[in-house]
Every structure is written in structure tokens, then in C-alpha cells.
């Protein structure tokens, strides 16, 4: 086969996947791979999506440049995934092949064959091929122009005067607001947004620096610059004698500069049926600190980011001492007043892990014993939430009862905060922490393996709207956040980060270490195209990127380096699967659930990819 013909067939195969990504599953045999590629020494598995009548007998790994067959194997049957349609999956395992290069997988079933998209095998592949784009994405999301100028003199929400809060990053493809967090009224689903971006950039900078690879040097320079840009914004959002403003809203159909304002905490989503509809709001928050964040609504991670920024090798627009001052003042305020800022006035697991990260970073920046004591207390509170009930052993308890913690974007943050804490804890507390982390991650691994799951997608323990507790692939549609639900690429990337952070700590258990590395890689493979829809969800990488449409308009276009929301449960089946079933199918503004880019997805992806791995 000539290279030109081979490339035409590969292109046609991928283009077919692009055009049909919203179909439930294709009838023809498909070869699903990580469309960027695989680490040289890591497991390398392609998945074959086949009809029940298909019985692929052989797979071959073909060198893209020459057409030479370099590896041959027999696919292993993996079976169906319950309620994901009638597709049967087969595994093509070529893990033992470790020669860097560009390759294609070919699957044969009698006279029928199928080709994968081309992919690469190399060391530090995702760092090399994707990290730069993600950093550029954040720079492209910086507030600028007329909107940024408006943000430099926004009216104070609770009195006369104006405040300069320019800077920050626009939240999503179609949202030019700038948010610390959202979903306040849900109690359990506050997501970490702009502060998370700042923290992951700076923590990722430290991580890459510690890996001591000159190939990363320019990434480090740009991550430091971007992280300090975020820290500068957090300083501007800091309220004197208080916490931080939570949000800058960019409301209105035309998103005009003059409409921008400090955001109300009590935001509620409306699923629109017309483009000119606006989101609903509950009665506005009231009180002297009504527009300020709690630990769980962005304050804890903002403090962590500012404390970490104060340890960087250079200043941003503000000196490093100012970063630390803002962090210490906000921490002192929230230690005294956090419950007053909560919608239900009751702390839960989100407050624990956000405050733990804040205290840990403050101790790292200052070595003040008061911060280590605060971190010890929050770590103890968090670890006490490991709970066993019925068949569910060592899950995180979200409240003071038995409600499981599950989260659409930050599921890995309890472990991330504990592993970060373990670096400063006493020997006794470190031992206790590593035991808790292992128990938690063993639960995650067991839940993921509980059912047939050839993709290794991170499953979760959830609480349905009727109170039933069960395991599931995807975030339920009937939680306190309803009608808000969307794809979970941030969730699985946060779990990949948690697993990669934890893995080096368990050198005495190679099997557990390997399981964590596999688990992390499986989540990244899913994002990069090894999923049932053959769609890379990192814009500009791989194939099958789906466009974000707003009522049939493409005016909001996702940026290269962005990670979109991703795959969800079925529209009418919590155990089903759906992707890109928007306005054209539902008659509602549902496209964002799958196709919209969002800061937390890229933030967690960047951090996971920055971490050392095998």
C-alpha cells in the first residue's frame, strides 16, 4: 500500500468518525486509540468497537512512514458495556512494542479491515505534543480589550464606589464571566475555577522544574508567567478585611462591557429554548460579605495559589510579599467566618480539602506553626470522612452522615490536598495520611473495575435525586445541581492527577503503583480519543473535535488547547451514554453539556500531564 493511499484511508476513517460522532454507535468496525499516542514504556492498548457479528482475528501495528508491519497480535474479547448500545469491544495490546515512531493499527476480520488514526509512541509524549497548546489556551482566555477595561472600574455591589478587578481568564467558550466558583446553592458541588487555574499552573511549574529536563524550560517560563497573571487577579479580587469577590458576571445576549458586574452568589442555570433567554436567579445574597467566597467556593484554592505564588522566583504585577499578605489575610478571615459565607452554614468535605490545601501552601511559604496546626486539623477532619457502608468500603463521606462525596470536576482534590499535605506533615501524620490516601484510591480502583469497563473510565459512587446510593459511570442528572450536568473531563483529569501524585509514595507496593499509573493513563486516553465516539476532546489534537454550537450558530468557537466538557450519561438513561446531542436533537440549549470548553478541564489536564510518570 502506498503511503498516499494509506493516508487517504486513515483520513477517511477518521473523517467518518468526525461526521458521525453524535450517533449512538457506528455499525462498522472502528479502531479506537489515544490519538496523540502512547508513552514508550507504558501499556499500549487500542480498542476495537465492533458489531456482535464481527470477530476480528488479527491486528497489526504499521509504521506510518514505510508501511512496514512491526507488530502482530490477536485481539482479546472485552465484551459489551451495559446500556452503551450493542457494540462489542476487543483489545489490541501492543504494550511490549517500545520503538518510538508514528504508527497505525490495522484490524482484520476476514475480508474486512479497519484502520486507526495515526498516533505516536515516544517518551514524555503528552508534554511534548499537548502541553504547549494548553498553556497557549490559558493565555488566549485572558480578559482583554473593552471587557477588561470595564472590569477595571466595576461598581461595588454593596455600597458606593468602584473596584479594579481587571485580569483573570474567561470561563468557557460561551461565558465571558470570570468565576472563582459556581453552584453555591448545591452545597456539595462547588467547582474550583480561576483559582484552580492559577494553582495548577504554579504547581505544574514547580513539578516540571523538579523533573530537571531542559525540554520543559520554555514551558516552565510560560507557566510561571501565566500563573502569576492569575495571582495578580486574585489580589485584585481580595476584599479589605474579608475574603474575595466570587465572580465577575458578563450577562446579556450581547455580553456588553457596560453590563459587566460583580456577580451574585445565588446563580441558577436555565436550560434555554431561545438564544435571548437569561439565567434565573434566586433572591440575591445579603449581608456585609454577601458577594464573598467561602473556603469551598474558591477561597481556599485562591489562598493556596497566592501562597504558592509568593514562593516563585519572580514577582508579577504585584510583589511576592503582597501575594502572601493577601493569602494570610483571607485565611484569617475565613478561619473565623467561613460558616457565615456558606449557603447552608454547615461545613462539609469541600471546605476540608480546600482549607487543607490553603493551610498547607501557607505553611510551605512561611513555616509558621499555626498553619501547620491548621493543616493538621483539616487533614484529620478530611481523613475521618473515609467511610464504609454496605458494600462500599472506604469512600469519602461528604457530610456528617453517610452521603458519598462525588463531584463533576474536582473528584481528585481530596487526595491531591492530602498528598500535598504529606510533604509537610510530621512523620506520624505522614504515615496516617498515606494510609488514608491508599484506602481512598483502592476504593476508586475497585469501583472502576466493578463492571465490564474496557476503557478503564473512572467510575464513581453517587447519590441519586431520590436518595439511592449506587455506583455509576457518569454524574447523575437529578442532583441538587439540576438541571446542570455536563461532561466530566475535569473530574477524570483530577483523578489522573491524584493517582500520579500518589503513585511514587508507594514504592513498597509495585502492584498498587502500577494500578495507579494505569488508571491515570486510562483517563488521559479517554480525553484524547480512546473513547466510544472516537473523538479527541482536546481541541487541536487528534481527530473528531466536535464544534460548540449555540442554537445552530458557530459564533462561539472553542480554542486550540482547550478541553471540552465531554461525554455524559444518556439524555434519558442514567446508565446510558451520550455525546454531542444538542439543540438539533433536543430543541434546547444542550450543546454546552458536551461541546463547550471550560477552564477546569484544561487546568486539571495540564497538572496531570506535568506530573512525573513512568
For each feature predicted by the language model, list its residue ranges.
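N-terminal secretory signal peptides that target proteins for export/translocation
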Residues: 1-5
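Bacterial N-terminal signal peptides
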Residues: 7-19
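Aromatic (Trp/Tyr) and acidic
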Residues: 35-111, 139-195, 204, 250-309, ...
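Transcriptional activation interfaces
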Residues: 199, 203-205, 209, 217-257, ...
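Short coil/linker segments at helix-helix boundaries
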Residues: 203-229, 283-290, 308-326
Amino acid at each position: 500500500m502506498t503511503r498516499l493511499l494509506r493516508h487517504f484511508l486513515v483520513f477517511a476513517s477518521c473523517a467518518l468518525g468526525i461526521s458521525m460522532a453524535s450517533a449512538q454507535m457506528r455499525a462498522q468496525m472502528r479502531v479506537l486509540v489515544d490519538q496523540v499516542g502512547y508513552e514508550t514504556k507504558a501499556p499500549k492498548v487500542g480498542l476495537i468497537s465492533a458489531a456482535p457479528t464481527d470477530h476480528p482475528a488479527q491486528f497489526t501495528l504499521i509504521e506510518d512512514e514505510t508501511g512496514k508491519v512491526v507488530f502482530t497480535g490477536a485481539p482479546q474479547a472485552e465484551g459489551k458495556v451495559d446500556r452503551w448500545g450493542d457494540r462489542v469491544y476487543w483489545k489490541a495490546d501492543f504494550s511490549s512494542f517500545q520503538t518510538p515512531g508514528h504508527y497505525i493499527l490495522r484490524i482484520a476480520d476476514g475480508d474486512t479491515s479497519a484502520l486507526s488514526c495515526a498516533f505516536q509512541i515516544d517518551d514524555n509524549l503528552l508534554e511534548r505534543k499537548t502541553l504547549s497548546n494548553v498553556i497557549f489556551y490559558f493565555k488566549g482566555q485572558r480578559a482583554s480589550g473593552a471587557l477588561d477595561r470595564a472590569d477595571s472600574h466595576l461598581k461595588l455591589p454593596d455600597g458606593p464606589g468602584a473596584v479594579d478587578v481587571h485580569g483573570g481568564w474567561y470561563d468557557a467558550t460561551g461565558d465571558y464571566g470570570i468565576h472563582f466558583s459556581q453552584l453555591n446553592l448545591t452545597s456539595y458541588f462547588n467547582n474550583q475555577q480561576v483559582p484552580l487555574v492559577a494553582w495548577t499552573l504554579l504547581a505544574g511549574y514547580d513539578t516540571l522544574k523538579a523533573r530537571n529536563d531542559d525540554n520543559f524550560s520554555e514551558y516552565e517560563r510560560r507557566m510561571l508567567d501565566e500563573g502569576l497573571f492569575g495571582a495578580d487577579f486574585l489580589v485584585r479580587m481580595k476584599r479589605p478585611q474579608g475574603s474575595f469577590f466570587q465572580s465577575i458576571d458578563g450577562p446579556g445576549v450581547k455580553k456588553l462591557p457596560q453590563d459587566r458586574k460583580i456577580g451574585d452568589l445565588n446563580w441558577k442555570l436555565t436550560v434555554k429554548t431561545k438564544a435571548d433567554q437569561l439565567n434565573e436567579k434566586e433572591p440575591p445574597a445579603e449581608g456585609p460579605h454577601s458577594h464573598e467566597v467561602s473556603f469551598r467556593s474558591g477561597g481556599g484554592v485562591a489562598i493556596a495559589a497566592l501562597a504558592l505564588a509568593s514562593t516563585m522566583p519572580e514577582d508579577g504585577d504585584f510583589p511576592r510579599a503582597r501575594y502572601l499578605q493577601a493569602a494570610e489575610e483571607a485565611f484569617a478571615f475565613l478561619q473565623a467566618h467561613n460558616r457565615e459565607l456558606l449557603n447552608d452554614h454547615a461545613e462539609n468535605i469541600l471546605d476540608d480539602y480546600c482549607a487543607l490545601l490553603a493551610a498547607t501552601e501557607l505553611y510551605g511559604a512561611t513555616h509558621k506553626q499555626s498553619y501547620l496546626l491548621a493543616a493538621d486539623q483539616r487533614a484529620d477532619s478530611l481523613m475521618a470522612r473515609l467511610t464504609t457502608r454496605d458494600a462500599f468500603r472506604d469512600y469519602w463521606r461528604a457530610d456528617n452522615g453517610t452521603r458519598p462525596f462525588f463531584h463533576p470536576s474536582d473528584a481528585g482534590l481530596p487526595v491531591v490536598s492530602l498528598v500535598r499535605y504529606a510533604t509537610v506533615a510530621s512523620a506520624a501524620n505522614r504515615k496516617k495520611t498515606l494510609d488514608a490516601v491508599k484506602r481512598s484510591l483502592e476504593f476508586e480502583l475497585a469501583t472502576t473495575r466493578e463492571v465490564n469497563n474496557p476503557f478503564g473510565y473512572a467510575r464513581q459512587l453517587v447519590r441519586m435525586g431520590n436518595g439511592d446510593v449506587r455506583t455509576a459511570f457518569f454524574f447523575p442528572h437529578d442532583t441538587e445541581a439540576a438541571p446542570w450536568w455536563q461532561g466530566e473531563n475535569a473530574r477524570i483529569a483530577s483523578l489522573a492527577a491524584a493517582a500520579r501524585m500518589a503513585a511514587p509514595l508507594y514504592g513498597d507496593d509495585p502492584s498498587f503503583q502500577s494500578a495507579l499509573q494505569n488508571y491515570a493513563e486510562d483517563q488521559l486516553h479517554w480525553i484524547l480519543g480512546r473513547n466510544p465516539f472516537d473523538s479527541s476532546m482536546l481541541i487541536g489534537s487528534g481527530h473528531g473535535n466536535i464544534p460548540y454550537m449555540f442554537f445552530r450558530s458557530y459564533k462561539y468557537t472553542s480554542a486550540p488547547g482547550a478541553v471540552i466538557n465531554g461525554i455524559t450519561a444518556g439524555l434519558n438513561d442514567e446508565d446510558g451514554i451520550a455525546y454531542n446531542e444538542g439543540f438539533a436533537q433536543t430543541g434546547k440549549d444542550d450543546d454546552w453539556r458536551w461541546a463547550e470548553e471550560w477552564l477546569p478541564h484544561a487546568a486539571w489536564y495540564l497538572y496531570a500531564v506535568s506530573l512525573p510518570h513512568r
